[in-house]
Structures are given as structure tokens and as C-alpha cells.
Design a protein with these regions (language model features):
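C-terminal capping/extension of enzyme domains
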Residues: 1-36, 86, 93-96, 119-146, ...
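A short, well-structured juxtamembrane/interface segment
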Residues: 37-49
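Adenosine ribonucleotide-centric catalytic and binding domains
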Residues: 49-101
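Extracellular/periplasmic catalytic domains that process cell-envelope and extracellular macromolecules
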Residues: 51-52, 106-109, 186
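Short, well-ordered beta-to-alpha junction loops that form the rim of enzyme active sites
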Residues: 62, 117, 154-158
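Conserved nucleotide-cofactor-binding alpha/beta core module
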Residues: 96, 100-104, 109, 123
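Short active-site oxyanion
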Residues: 146-152
Length: 233
């Protein structure tokens, strides 16, 4: 049931530890064998094929698409190339703030770690496995933030509840396109950018919504100041 082929060795110790602890142990041994679930077995841990030292930005999603054959193992990325409303709004924000069109398919190769809060879901039952994965996800977030401080996109309440697990946080808040140029820079900081989840309802609420969050522009400013290659969104 548990397929770990392709996982980078930098993640193997923490993954082995996590899947042998409750409640994940019960999920894999008792629940998943008896139900239809998403994504495919070989894609459950797909996100961990990236070496930890290559991560520049972590995007925390919710749980996999529960419709058969749509979940890819990476947040926001649909296996059928269907563009969800959330991803449409992400692309709109990318275009508005950077002038780029946006293509999530090229993100992983640039060091963007597309982590769902839960890595499995019962087919047709969104949110059904979130409680099983919460401890594991917290552990992964602590591990990444300690081993390789980076930039974090926390969109929505589900992602933001993991903020407490991030070491040495620097909250990117109160900046605009001019002030962001003066942001304090340290390779010891985990830069946290927060906004509502990019659903249609939150996209159009101006300063209180996803629209105008400027995360994609600000992330590139931070990367450039850290002497890292900027993201081609």
C-alpha cells in the first residue's frame, strides 16, 4: 500500500517515522485498503521527490481533488490539466502583479514545493482524511523550515493553522511595491506570506482578499535579494 519509490533521500527519515505513527499507521493499514481514494498510490508522496535543499517556496494547499483521476499528488495541479477556479484566480493574480501568464506545470522544476495539507482523500468525499494527516504535515513543515529556511505561501485558514510549526518566521505584512525593496534579508528567515484562499469569493475583496496580495511579485523580490534565481511564474 505504501509506495515510496522516487522520494528523495533527504525526506525518507521523516516520512518513515510519520507513516509508522498513529493516526497515519491506521489510515494505511485499515482504511485505505477498504475504500476508493485519491490520488493513485504511487502519487501519494509525489511532492517529496524534490530534494529539500532545492526548495525555494512552499505552497500549502488543502487536500487532493476527490474526483477520480484528477488528483496529481501536488496541490492545485490537476492530473487532467483541468484548471480549477482557484488556479484561475492564482493565474489572474500572477498576471496582475507580474505581467506573466502563469503555468503551474513549470513550478516544481524551479523549486516550488506544492504540499497539500492532507495527501489522500476518499473518492467523492472532500476533507475526509485531513485529520489523519495533520500531525504528519506539521512535522514536515517543521522539518523543512528548520533544514532549509524558505518562502511560505499560506492561503486560507487550513494552511495558516500550520504557521505555528514554522521556525524563525518573518511575517511579510504591511509592505507595498515600494517598501518590499527594504525588507530585511537573512537566509535564516522563513518568509511567510498570508492571504485568503484563492476561491472566487475571496479573490474580489480588495485588500482583504486574495486579489492584490502581490505574493508572486514579493517572493521574487525576496529571492533576488537572497541571490537566488527568480521564479518564472
Amino acid at each position: 500500500m505504501i509506495k515510496l519509490e522516487g522520494i528523495h533521500k533527504s525526506f525518507l527519515p521523516v516520512i518513515y517515522s510519520g507513516i509508522n505513527q498513529e493516526p497515519l499507521k491506521s489510515l494505511f493499514e485499515n482504511i485505505l485498503p477498504a475504500i476508493s481514494f485519491q490520488p493513485r498510490e504511487e502519487d501519494i508522496f509525489k511532492v517529496f521527490r524534490m530534494p529539500i535543499d532545492k526548495i525555494k517556496i512552499v505552497v500549502i494547499g488543502q487536500d487532493p481533488y476527490s474526483i477520480p483521476n484528477e488528483a496529481s499528488g501536488l496541490c492545485f495541479l490537476n492530473e487532467t490539466n483541468k484548471v480549477s477556479n482557484s488556479l484561475k484566480n492564482i493565474y489572474r493574480e500572477i498576471n496582475s502583479s507580474t505581467g506573466m501568464e502563469g503555468d503551474i506545470h513549470c513550478w516544481e522544476q524551479q523549486g516550488i514545493f506544492l504540499l497539500n495539507s492532507a495527501l489522500t482523500v476518499e473518492t467523492g468525499n472532500p476533507g475526509s482524511h485531513i485529520s489523519y494527516w495533520e500531525l504528519f504535515t506539521s512535522t514536515i513543515i517543521r522539518y523543512i523550515s528548520y533544514k532549509n529556511p524558505c518562502i511560505w505561501f499560506l492561503w486560507g485558514k487550513m494552511a495558516q493553522k500550520f504557521e505555528k510549526d514554522i521556525y524563525s518566521p518573518f511575517i511579510v505584512k504591511g509592505y507595498d511595491n515600494k517598501l518590499i525593496q527594504d525588507i530585511p534579508i537573512s537566509n535564516q528567515y522563513n518568509y511567510i506570506l498570508k492571504a485568503p484562499y484563492p476561491i472566487t469569493e475571496s479573490y474580489s475583496k480588495g485588500a482583504s482578499g486574495f486579489y492584490g496580495c502581490n505574493h508572486f511579485k514579493y517572493a521574487n523580490v525576496i529571492l533576488e535579494k537572497l541571490k537566488e534565481t527568480k521564479i518564472q511564474w
